[in-house]
Regions:
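Short, charged helix-capping/linker segments at alpha-helix termini
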Residues: 2, 14-23, 33-52, 158, ...
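Sigma70-family region 2
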Residues: 14-15, 41, 52-69, 89-91
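Short, basic/polar amphipathic helix motif occurring as a linker/hinge flanking DNA-binding modules
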Residues: 3, 86-105, 181-185
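C-terminal edge and immediately downstream basic/flexible tail or linker adjoining helix-turn-helix-like DNA-binding
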Residues: 116, 124, 152-159, 169-191
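Arg/Lys-rich amphipathic alpha helix in sigma70-family domain 2
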Residues: 59-66, 77-97, 115
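Structural recognition of an alpha-helix C-terminal capping motif at a helix-to-coil junction
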Residues: 48-55, 69-81
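Helix-turn-helix DNA-binding module
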Residues: 123-135, 139-160
Length: 191
């Protein structure tokens, strides 16, 4: 038996079907959490955004127009906009450079430490990017969306997404190269 499509589930949610809403959450929650965590830099804020995304699904399901866009694209747009709103509100009031826990791996302790340090440096550099560039990188590289879909989510042209990605990649390269040089110099001094 085929699983119901997102459009079918949203129609059921519009009729008050809680099980359909849970099914949509089961299907999309992990990606919304990952997107929000990368955008916001911490898990607690990401969980709040993900909850708000699905609260909006519940409260606005009757407005969904099947065929106008993919449901997943709409969810990404809602999550991205909520993240951008949250970043704008906290600008100047909170340190955006807080580094969340990095991904773990199976290699030995030394390699795990190196991987965590690299992940932390990349995450810190990502958090220093301007909001729109960060959103473009997160959608493209971490959410594996194409430029057309990212453009739709961000409400810009494909060319604008390509420009945002180009500038973001350049800034990340410069930030990480500068940090690498500083790290090497500090190791030479301490050696």
């Amino acid at each position: 038996m085929d699983k119901p499509s997102d459009d079918e589930l949203v129609a059921a949610v519009a009729s008050g079907d809680e099980a359909a809403c849970r099914a949509l959450m089961d299907r999309h929650l992990a990606r919304m959490l990952a997107l929000a965590r990368r955008m916001l830099g911490n898990h607690a804020d990401a969980e709040e955004v993900a909850q708000e995304v699905f609260l909006r699904v519940w409260t606005h399901a009757e407005r969904w127009e099947p065929g106008k866009a993919q449901f997943g694209t709409w969810l990404h747009r809602v999550a991205t906009n909520l993240c951008l709103d949250r970043l704008r509100r906290r600008r100047g009031t909170e340190d955006i450079d807080a580094i969340p826990e990095p991904a773990s791996g199976e290699p030995g302790p030394d390699r795990q430490l190196e991987q965590r340090e690299l992940a932390a440096r990349v995450e810190a550099a990502l958090q220093r990017l301007p909001e729109r560039q960060r959103a473009a990188i997160v959608l493209s590289h971490y959410q594996d969306l194409g430029n057309i879909e990212a453009a739709d989510i961000l409400g810009v042209t494909v060319e604008a997404v390509e420009s945002l990605l180009s500038r973001a990649r350049r800034q990340l390269r410069v930030a990480l190269a500068t940090e690498k040089d500083e790290l090497l110099r500090s190791r030479e001094i301490n050696a």
